[in-house]
Amino acid sequence: MPKLKTRKSARKRFYISAKGKFVRKRAFKSHILEKKTSKRKRNLKRKMIVFKGENLALKTMLPYLR
C-alpha cells in the first residue's frame, strides 16, 4: 500500500494539542487592525479548538500528525 500524502496547506494551519484536539489560529488578525479595539485584537491572539465535525476531514488530510 502506498504512503498517504499530507495536505501541506493543512499542515501549516493546524496542530494537535496535548489532549489530542486540533487547534488553529483565529481569522481577522493579519491586517486592517487600526479600527479593531485592543480587546478584540487581544482576544484574536488566542488559539481556537476545531469543531468535532471537522476532525475526520483533518485526520484524512493529516494522516501522520501525532
Swiss-Prot record:
Ribosomal protein as UniProt keyword: yes
Localisation: Plastid, Chloroplast
Cellular component GO terms held in the UniProt record: chloroplast; large ribosomal subunit
Record-linked Pfam families: Ribosomal_L35p (PF01632)
One of the protein's GO biological processes: translation
GO molecular function terms listed in the Swiss-Prot or TrEMBL record: structural constituent of ribosome
Gene3D superfamilies, A to Z: 4.10.410.60
Keyword Ubl conjugation set for record: no
UniProt keywords, alphabetically: Chloroplast, Plastid, Ribonucleoprotein, Ribosomal protein
Stored InterPro entries: Ribosomal_bL35, Ribosomal_bL35-like, Ribosomal_bL35_CS, Ribosomal_bL35_sf
Family: Belongs to the bacterial ribosomal protein bL35 family.
UniProt name for this protein: Large ribosomal subunit protein bL35c
Lineage, top ranks: Eukaryota, Cryptophyceae, Pyrenomonadales, Geminigeraceae, Guillardia
